Amino acid sequence: MLTYTGIHVTKEFGAPSIVDIAVQSMRLIRFSGAGEVNWPIGMHMLLVADLVVPNDDPWRRLYALLHDAAEVAVADVPRPMKTTEARAVEDAVEARIYASLGIPEPSDDTRQAVKLADFRAALAEGSCGCSGRGFEYTQTHYLPDNGAISTLREYLARFTIDEAFRPEGHWPKAYEARVRTVLREVQQDRYHPDRAGAA
């Protein structure tokens, strides 16, 4: 495939740029478009970055901001439909994104923290009309996460699909700026555990 900026990405080579991720992730709608709200992957990644703990850790915020970035090349396939091969391709693209940004793979602790924040975000999205109706009833022992729901509602109050879809819109620019800011922070943090794999 060719990205927004013209980068060639295949199963074997290439990685989308920060601009590609910012623009394209705001055009990919979560939950296969089943929600009452057209809620993009890019907005989801911003939400996850707000929910990851500890939130003063720039490495965790960075990996949260990038946790679905590979989907701009492989699409957002709902988990029950994703094959083992599709997951392997997504993982390979994700690894190339990290390499292109000069960052290591996240530590196991960071992966777990991002996974938890991702789950909290998904449940909040399911509660606020971003997924298909009845999402919360498909989740075992579902309990509303008021903190995550409140954070999501703050975004929803300001969100418009037009400002997400346009490359020069507010949300692609906000996402790009946030990634670049956090990248600068982690480049100054040479002793963090997630830095151990970096050259």
Language-model features: locations:
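Metal-dependent phosphohydrolase cores
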Residues: 1-199
